[in-house]
């Protein structure tokens, strides 16, 4: 489980000192209590066993670095050394000129020291210090140790308000003062510089330091140096030189290191309040500060990988670049050992070079070129926010004080935690490293130039791969998961407390501290403005004329009485208005009810009118359809439609049935019988229509077996009007009966024509009937030919057609007359009604006029 900075996403490592903090501490509401307890945690002494272990490991690292630096210097050719010296002299020439012109002596409370010239500093070996200056440094070191011992034994005093801004970093990063904060610091004022900081930026390669080292190095700023006065700056330089001398004496060799860490540098300020300011700092002296760059001679750097080692759970040192002098390739000296107190610019002058906002400058490590770093495992964009391994504080689990993970409000048991650890073991093998083992070095040493030897790089890569394989084979302890979870939960709680996402790297910590200082300065300005305004108000007039106040009071009392009277009047008016509003509301309610009833009646009548209109439209449509149907019925006649009389050549037809026969066109008797039956039915229907009764004969319509009965003979005789094709003796008698029946039918037609002529004298038939002759043709079948008989039957049907036409015409005339008679009756009735209505209206008008006259 990797840790990343929440601003720049730089990879970080967890420090064991953070796990000593009780997370319930941050649940307190009083911030002062939190600060006091964190200060107590920061002053815990380091065990002696751990100190010895750290010293041994640092000595081993130094020996390895010296061997690698010597090998690299021996391999490097003199030609490349000369080229690099020329290159660096060209790069840093301007800075040397600036420092030669601006080099001054820092002000110290002791006797001032002389500033060496730039020519003396350009030599590969540092110049010897004067005896007076060495005695002065020893005295300062002794006072520094006494003060640090005093602060380590005495309890911490409550921090005053003025110093809380300076201790903001110390408040939220208590692990910077714990036992795992630096490489071999003994919290007693003595600084052990025998080892090289594992995460020093000036080590030559860009490594990921532990959180404690980032926090310690970030606390060193010009503000913290200047707060202690000139004494603290001189003590700092003296400590650096003394520590370097002690390291050289112990190892009897020249140490190639570009990083010197000083821990728990305690300085007592010269202010009137004589407040004790404890500033725990880790100063990283590299080639970033312009004053130090001017004093360091031209050197060529060769990258030498160092074997990673674990020092108390902290991050091992990445491959550090050893600096070799251009004059000699075998002897490698540290640039920090050649720095004298006079080479460090005074805090007052450094503060003059700050930004317009007067933000304190910090001695920051060198900004490495990221393009020169290539990872053997996988490339990482360390300063971009597009990293897929960004850490979200909201997703971190909460870890209890006993090490159990709190899931959904309850702590998981031991078995569950072990199962969880086994479940996530694959993930931990790939993403996290055990706290007890040395972590994998993810970045190779930084190549200072293109002339470095490639063999050293290959050896360092092989060593790194072997170390990675060994570390991957080591079993990850179950405690590591809970340690990481506990640390992450601590970051989460601290994030909720200070409203800043944690953890943060060194640069981001400095930025956040600067932001907090800006906010504090703004708030201080506001406080000063408010305090000045308050003082101005307090210094104002406290005594005024009582007479004027009395007059104003009387005027105000009078105005108050007037306003009270106005308020009483307004209350009375308000009551009256409320009564009026109640009355008006009652009237509005009654009017609304009347309006509702009116509109309901209106809607009902409106609906009725629409319904009546619909009914009227329906009745008019029905009347129109009935009239049209009536007209069509008037134009039709039952007899005319039922009996269609026409002709077919020489044959007369009734309903397309031929009546008669010819030699050339023989007709069957079935057709002739059916035609005679229709003729008998037509004549009988016309007689009944005209309400006429024949005198001698009675027509009996019976389809194909119709006949004519004679009534004046007793018993009555029946004459058949149908025949057959049978040839027998009885056929002779049949001809006689058939001929008599046809003669009787002609006689009936003649009687009906005479009856019609009585009603309508103008009526006449085209063919006259005289006994058995019609139109001069004999109708008998016996003793005549077929042509004559067929023609006589055609004349008979023609007379029937004329009679039918007259009946239809007469019937329409009678109907029309009846309609006119009924219409005239209706008109007469309407006229009578109108006359009566007019009379009634006149009478009513007269009565009304009389009533009006009386009134």
Curated annotation (Swiss-Prot):
Residues 92-212, 236-271, 294-380, 407-475, 826-855 are annotated as: Disordered. Residues 99-123, 131-143, 177-200, 294-348, 446-474 have a biased composition (Low complexity). Belongs to the beclin family. GO terms for molecular function: phosphatidylinositol 3-kinase binding; protein-macromolecule adaptor activity. It is a peripheral membrane protein. It comes from Dictyostelium discoideum (Social amoeba). One of its GO terms (cellular component) is phosphatidylinositol 3-kinase complex, class III, type I. This is Beclin-1-like protein B. Residues 144-156, 368-377, 413-445 have a biased composition (Polar residues). The gene is atg6B. PANTHER family: BECLIN 1, BECLIN-1. GO terms for biological process: autophagosome assembly; cellular response to nitrogen starvation; late endosome to vacuole transport; mitophagy; protein transport. Its main location: membrane. The keyword Repressor does not apply. Residues 538-595 form a coiled coil.
